[in-house]
Regions:
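General helical structural elements
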Residues: 7-8, 19, 252
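Short, isolated positions within intrinsically disordered regulatory regions of eukaryotic proteins
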Residues: 5-7, 27, 60, 215
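Bacterial N-terminal signal peptides
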Residues: 19-29
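A structural boundary/capping signal
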Residues: 34-331
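N-terminal secretory signal peptides that target proteins for export/translocation
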Residues: 1-15
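Generic detector of N-terminal low-structure segments
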Residues: 4, 31-32
């Protein structure tokens, strides 16, 4: 009995990845003329942590400033691995797992060959007992799936279905956001303490949005070809003082979650952009979307356009109106 299977081609996964990550490649499409301006950024090391200091102009052109210290322990606890999906490395990871499993098989029962190819992995099983061959092949297929899932998890990737219903791989943005909440509590607290005690949550959002939008925007020459390597986890955005739309969206999600630990939140993905939604009571002029029966007020931390809380750009509005967006819940 001879059975052979060919794994899903990793090069094909990579080709879809390029499509799946297309929304990460953002052009500055905002029609708003007012731009955020960071006036000062300073980062200083201390025995206990890293002190961050900022000055910027808010939406009213008022000079704002803030400082906060992130303890070394918090920085160490936060995910800092930057995503860069490489199909060949993923293939090698899976191949090693398959070969280790194949070593456990008694050669008297079956002969197994694991053959990595350019864009696939062939699994060949030969043996006299058909049922045994089928069982071995089934087990190896399970090992293959588990190994690939382990690779994705270890490197902070997740599966993603594009608006074109294509399967893809992307950084696990919501996981980055969730695992960065506790490390960023001190940063979120600094903004909370700066807002007037009598103000509502919108004052917090206005302040933190103007700060996020003033952080320099990272325009990559060819983000698609980079396989997602332009993405920076929240701590990295702070350390490097630069970030693109998805990087800033995840940073914002982490800090807002620390401020509102139980309020429902979402990330909204457009073909060329990413923004956020929060389940607060909307005002008359707020741009909202409904997801799973819940109404979310939209906000966009990208910058440098100064877009107020509850408002979106004209391009974003066109995508929302036509339903060309996808939603992921933030835990």
């Amino acid at each position: 009995m001879f059975r052979k299977i060919t794994s899903p081609p990793l090069s094909a996964i990579n080709r879809v990845l390029l499509v799946g990550l297309y929304w990460l490649s953002v052009g500055l499409f905002f029609s708003v003329t007012a731009g955020a301006e960071q006036l000062k950024f300073k980062k200083a090391q201390s025995e206990s942590g890293v002190l961050f200091s900022y000055e910027w102009l808010d939406m009213d052109s008022t000079r704002q400033s803030i400082s906060f210290e992130l303890p070394h322990t918090a920085i160490k606890a936060a995910p800092t691995q930057q995503a860069n999906y490489r199909p060949k490395i993923a293939q090698r990871y899976v191949t090693v797992a398959l070969m280790e499993e194949a070593k456990k098989i008694n050669p008297k029962e079956a002969r197994v060959k694991i053959i990595p190819k350019r864009d696939s992995i062939d699994i060949q099983v030969k043996g006299a007992n058909e049922d045994k061959v089928e069982a071995i092949l089934s087990n190896l297929k399970a090992v293959q799936r588990e190994a690939y899932n382990a690779y994705l998890d270890e490197h902070y990737f997740t599966r993603f279905t594009t608006l074109f219903n294509q399967k893809a791989i992307k950084p696990d943005h919501t996981r980055y956001a969730t695992e960065s909440v506790k490390p960023l509590v001190a940063a979120s607290q600094a903004f909370y303490e700066k807002v007037n005690a009598q103000s509502d949550s919108r004052a917090y959002f206005s302040l933190i949005l103007s700060w996020l939008q003033s952080i320099p925007y990272d325009t990559l020459e060819d983000r698609v070809v980079s396989n997602g390597s332009g993405y920076a986890p929240p701590i990295n955005v702070l350390m490097q003082n630069v970030g693109d739309c998805d990087s800033k969206a995840v940073l914002a999600s982490s800090m807002v979650r620390a401020f509102l630990p139980s309020t429902k939140m979402i990330m909204v993905f457009l073909p060329n952009h990413a923004l956020l939604g929060i389940a607060l009571t909307p005002m008359v002029d707020d741009r909202t979307i409904v997801h799973d029966g819940e109404t979310y007020v939209l906000y966009d931390p990208t910058g440098p356009a100064l877009i107020p809380f509850g408002q979106v750009s004209e391009d974003t509005e066109r995508y929302i109106v036509t339903g060309r967006y996808q939603v992921e819940a933030v835990d």
